[in-house]
């Protein structure tokens, strides 16, 4: 058994774990292991995790962040897609009886069912993750469009993506992820994390972002799933205008084009405008108009 005198988030211990298990990181999974304890303290503090909280973690890796979460939280439910890491996590987290690791792809998991199976639904629920850069947007979009309510979400991601979360309409950074976040959450960048504190070092710097649930909206779409569908379609081809992207979603039959134009008229939106110019409220109005035009 490896010595557990050092935290996992230590360059020497991280390399020792990798050496012991002959672990080579998979670039295809965006694996970079965090080795800075100050960053981990900051993540836990930013999430304001207490002993009454349940925490969902995405991508525990070799357990560096998981260890810190387990020390602070009531229970941690971690989703790890790479089955090579399961025996490593069994070893590195052996001292913690409040951690459950499941070998599942978070994008395919029934999150609500897993929470009901493994966690006490009466406790506050938070999500914390060091997200792989290549799949940050799909994971966040999936979480934000899902039916699980988190008190807050604290994620480490590529700084460029973090900048998008609080972007304004009409800017290059504004996109589907911006709208998905701003529909439900307030975004706050807590810390910029240099690439040098990872093994191996990624090619870009990271940032810790806290997303906090907003009060219930007074202006809501007729159906949230339809709303997110329209948002994704609007940004499917950024260089195309809204008219062309809506045709890609609904089709180019004459009657469909007529219905799309009807919806745009109802919403008083210029068909030549690009999605990046629309606010969250305008996307809600558009979604309802598409419903009125029998397209949704």
Swiss-Prot record:
Its EC number is 2.1.1.182. GO terms for cellular component: cytosol. S-adenosyl-L-methionine binds at residues 32, 34, 59, 80, 105, 130. SUPFAM superfamilies: S-adenosyl-L-methionine-dependent methyltransferases (SSF53335). The keyword Methyltransferase applies. CDD domains: AdoMet_MTases. One of its GO terms (molecular function) is RNA binding. Its main location: cytoplasm. It catalyses: adenosine(1518)/adenosine(1519) in 16S rRNA + 4 S-adenosyl-L-methionine = N(6)-dimethyladenosine(1518)/N(6)-dimethyladenosine(1519) in 16S rRNA + 4 S-adenosyl-L-homocysteine + 4 H(+). Belongs to the class I-like SAM-binding methyltransferase superfamily. rRNA adenine N(6)-methyltransferase family. RsmA subfamily. Specifically dimethylates two adjacent adenosines (A1518 and A1519) in the loop of a conserved hairpin near the 3'-end of 16S rRNA in the 30S particle. May play a critical role in biogenesis of 30S subunits. This is Ribosomal RNA small subunit methyltransferase A. The lineage of its organism: Bacteria, Bacillati, Bacillota, Bacilli, Lactobacillales.
């Amino acid at each position: 058994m490896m010595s557990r005198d050092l935290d996992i988030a230590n360059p020497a211990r991280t390399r020792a774990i990798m050496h012991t298990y002959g672990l080579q990181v998979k670039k295809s999974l965006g694996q970079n292991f965090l080795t800075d304890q100050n960053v981990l303290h900051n993540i836990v503090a930013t999430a304001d995790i207490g002993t009454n909280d349940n925490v969902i973690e995405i991508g525990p890796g070799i357990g560096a962040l998981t260890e810190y979460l387990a020390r602070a939280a009531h229970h941690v439910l971690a989703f790890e897609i790479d089955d090579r890491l399961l025996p490593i996590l069994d070893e590195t987290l052996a001292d913690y009886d409040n951690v459950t690791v499941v070998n599942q792809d978070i994008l395919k998991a029934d999150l609500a069912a897993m929470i009901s199976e493994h966690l006490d639904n009466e406790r506050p629920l938070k999500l914390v993750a060091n997200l792989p850069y290549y799949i940050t947007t799909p994971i966040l979009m999936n979480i934000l469009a899902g039916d699980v309510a988190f008190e807050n979400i604290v994620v480490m991601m590529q700084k460029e993506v973090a900048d998008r979360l609080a972007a304004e309409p009409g800017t290059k950074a504004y996109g589907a992820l911006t709208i998905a976040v701003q529909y439900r959450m307030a975004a706050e960048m807590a810390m910029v994390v240099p690439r040098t504190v990872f093994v191996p070092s990624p090619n870009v710097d990271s940032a810790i972002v806290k997303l906090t649930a907003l009060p219930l909206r007074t202006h809501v779409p007729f159906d949230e799933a339809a709303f997110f569908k329209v948002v994704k379609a609007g940004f499917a081809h950024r260089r195309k205008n809204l008219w062309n992207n809506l045709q890609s979603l609904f089709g180019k039959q004459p009657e469909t084009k007529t219905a799309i134009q009807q919806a745009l008229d109802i919403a008083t939106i210029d068909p030549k405008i690009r999605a990046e110019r629309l606010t969250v409220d305008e996307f809600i109005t558009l979604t309802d108009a598409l419903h009125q035009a029998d397209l949704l």
